[in-house]
């Protein structure tokens, strides 16, 4: 794994850390940081909020609110849109300050939009 992956993982994890006190921290390891809400989904499992996972080829940032509320992506910056894989995953080998700012704002909007299910 490239050394940049460690730095990228730490930066992405720091986006999620402020939300942890209102969530369930499922994983907090050097490779995986995962937050669930306190709400149970129809399948009986907790509803995911967000996660960061370090893989072999990239570091992934998952943000479930954009899956539930796709209109949150309407004004997404092109440099972040290029990083998307699927409906709620962003992949990075490295990340710059502009991308970090965009993800911070998107995460904040996702949290605010889903506040009713996040705080249950």
Which residues does each PLM region occupy?
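Charge-dense, helix-prone N-terminal extensions
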Residues: 1-120
